[in-house]
């Protein structure tokens, strides 16, 4: 039937589509809050991927108190674990930790550690917040490492078992069929 006063086959106007807006910095802001870069020639977004947020704040170190203590006493261990997962096994934990330890004694560990934060951000679409990676690591080195460790755990990785252990843990367990008999 329909609404009173309306005709059964009355044509409905098409829904209004809101086009994303492009600001002066060539960033596209869509209705759902996604931010991407605009193609200057066409004005269309090149990468309309939404930007994810960090799963925890920079100063939430005690959300994982065991990692906070380890990072406080031996940040090279945490950095090694992060490096192995972020680089998908290309940088073993021991190598990443040893390099970090050597650079730590020179007094500029943030130079090495901020690279892995940048890789993680690019890989998972995380914002460069609360400050650029190098500033975050320069002034809040231990907190930044803890946040990155927690982020990997939040995304389903266990940094303690390394890249190979995580790959193996994600493989489906196959069990042999039971109760098969020959028909004959």
Curated annotation (Swiss-Prot):
Transmembrane segments: 96-116
Membrane topology: Single-pass membrane protein
Biased composition (Polar residues): 1-10
Pfam family, one: PLAC8
Sorted UniProt keywords: Membrane, Transmembrane, Transmembrane helix
Family: Belongs to the cornifelin family.
Job description of the protein: May be involved in heavy metals transport.
Protein name per its UniProtKB record: Protein PLANT CADMIUM RESISTANCE 4
């Amino acid at each position: 039937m329909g609404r009173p006063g309306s005709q059964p086959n009355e044509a409905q106007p098409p829904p209004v589509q809101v086009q994303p807006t492009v600001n002066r910095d060539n960033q596209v802001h869509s209705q759902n809050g996604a931010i991407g870069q605009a193609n200057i020639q066409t004005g269309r977004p090149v990468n309309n991927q939404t930007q994810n947020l960090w799963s925890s704040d920079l100063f939430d170190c005690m959300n994982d108190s065991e990692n906070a203590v380890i990072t406080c006493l031996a940040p090279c261990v945490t950095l090694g674990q992060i490096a192995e997962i972020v680089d998908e096994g290309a940088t073993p934990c021991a190598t990443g930790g040893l390099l970090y330890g050597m650079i730590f004694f020179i007094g500029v560990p943030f130079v090495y550690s901020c690279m892995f934060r940048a890789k993680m951000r690019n890989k998972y679409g995380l914002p460069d917040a609360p400050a650029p990676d190098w500033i975050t690591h320069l002034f809040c080195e231990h907190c930044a490492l803890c946040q990155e460790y927690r982020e990997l755990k939040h995304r389903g990785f266990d940094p303690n078992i390394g890249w190979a252990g995580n790959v193996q843990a994600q493989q489906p367990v196959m069990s042999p069929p039971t109760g098969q008999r020959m028909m004959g």
